[in-house]
Amino acid sequence: MLKMRTALIIVLILTAALARAQSSDWQSHLREELPLLGHRNWIAIVDSAYPLQTSTGIETIETNSNHLDVIKEVFDQLSKVKHVRPVIFTDTELKAVPETDAAGITAYREALAKLLATSEPQSLPHEQIIAKLDEAGKTFHILVLKTNLTIPYTSVFIRLDCGYWTADQEKRLREKMRKP
């Protein structure tokens, strides 16, 4: 019994140390992984209550960092690469959460709007986005960066698309291929 308890304590200590190492090094991990990510991969910046998903392709990292800072860093890193471009999704619920139920939500919405001012984020119900990640995670890699934010429906989901080939170019190609 004592040996089992000691072993359990050691496992818990090692797990905590690993989590601490992961949270302090999420930026390096993002920089290393970004060149490997491509079209159909996702990056999600999520609040602290976001669930740990179990699809094999989903990797979750606890950043222990400010939510808006993580969003800024991800967009900064994405701006430095040419091979992918972000398609941004936010929770539909974000627009409806009242300040009286979630203190700080108004300031968050305003700050997020400034960060996303040059983009066109799409809005979908939270459960639909989780389902999209779950499905994509069966085949493609999903990087989930969990932050210390405790305001609901504040996650930002980024589906990566090809940075050097547009949807219009793909459509023209498919049309040309259909013609004899």
Regions from the PLM with identified roles:
Residues 1-8:
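Bacterial N-terminal signal peptides that target proteins for export
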Residues 41-44, 59, 85-89, 121, ...:
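Structural motif
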Residues 12-20:
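Hydrophobic h-region of N-terminal signal peptides that target proteins for export
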Residues 36-38, 80-83, 136-139:
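Flexible, charged surface loops at secondary-structure boundaries
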Residues 101-180:
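Glycine-rich, aromatic-bearing surface loops/beta-hairpins
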Residues 83-106:
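Ordered, amphipathic secondary-structure segments that act as subunit-interaction surfaces
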Residues 51-52, 60-82, 86, 106-126:
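Feature captures the catalytic cores and cofactor-binding loops of soluble hydro-lyases/lyases
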Residues 20-68:
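Long, hydrophobic N-terminal alpha-helical segment
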